């Protein structure tokens, strides 16, 4: 709805969701100054209505197709990986054998920690000697698959709010002095590693094996 955003007289409070509601559309269209802008906005409303009708049908078709994958019954046993998330996993990853280790998957899903270092060597008695110091962290890698990151991040966020083994993992990490955002990252990475391991082995979820690493 860029036409609304471009009109300076339109109050900024309208940047929420009210502009999309059917009962509010006539009021918003009336605020546009010329017929061309109103036509474009009305066309976008028509497109939005059509997409809203197609969305549940597309979702149902996606899940129906995903159910035919042999990995479906395995992945559906993992907590907080519902039908849509599993369908997205299957479509995005296609096969777990693309990732030799969990760290390869973490990098692909944007869960790998990026480090930087400088001045790694110093001259001692005329000889270069490597300094002993930890590299500096620069956050998570940005070149990643956003769909996959959203799947694992969404599942981990849901797990932190529901009692169970995964929430216990989250609370245990915090109890060791880790900040909440880093604890969520730890849980997200654990979920990704768990998914990779179960998918490769064809095993169903077992909460007693949460500490088993993916290989």
List where the protein language model places each region.
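Short helix-capping/linker segments at secondary-structure and domain boundaries
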Residues: 1-3, 94-98, 158-166, 193-207
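Glycine-rich, often acidic, oxyanion-interacting loops/wings at catalytic, nucleic-acid
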Residues: 1-74, 214
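Non-catalytic, well-ordered alpha-helical scaffold segments
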Residues: 2, 38, 42-45, 84-87, ...
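Short coil/turn segments at secondary-structure boundaries
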Residues: 3-19, 62, 118-121, 162-170, ...
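Short, conserved alpha-helical segments within structured domains
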Residues: 21-24, 77, 81, 144, ...
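Phosphate-backbone recognition surface of nucleic-acid-processing proteins
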Residues: 74-77, 83-84, 88-176, 180, ...
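Basic, amphipathic alpha-helical segments enriched in Lys/Arg and hydrophobic/aromatic residues
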Residues: 175-215
């Amino acid at each position: 709805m860029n036409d609304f955003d471009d009109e300076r007289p339109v109050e900024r409070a309208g940047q929420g969701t009210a502009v999309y509601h059917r009962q509010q559309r006539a009021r918003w269209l009336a605020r546009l100054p010329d017929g061309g802008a109103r036509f474009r906005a009305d066309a976008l409303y028509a497109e939005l209505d059509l997409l809203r009708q197609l969305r549940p049908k597309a979702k149902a078709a996606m899940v129906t197709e995903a159910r035919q994958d042999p990995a479906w019954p395995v992945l559906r046993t993992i907590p907080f990986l519902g039908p849509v998330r599993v369908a997205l996993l299957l479509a995005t990853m296609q096969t777990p054998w693309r990732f030799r280790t969990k760290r390869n998957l973490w990098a692909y899903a944007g869960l790998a920690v990026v480090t930087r270092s400088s001045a790694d060597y110093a001259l001692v008695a005329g000889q270069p000697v490597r300094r002993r110091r930890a590299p500096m962290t620069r956050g998570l890698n940005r070149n990643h698959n956003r769909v996959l990151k959203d799947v694992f991040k969404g599942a981990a966020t849901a797990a932190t709010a529901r009692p169970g083994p995964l929430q216990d993992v989250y609370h245990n990490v915090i109890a060791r002095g880790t900040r909440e955002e880093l604890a969520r990252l730890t849980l997200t990475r654990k979920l990704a590693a768990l998914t990779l391991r179960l998918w490769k082995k064809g095993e169903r979820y077992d909460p007693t094996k949460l500490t088993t690493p993916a290989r």
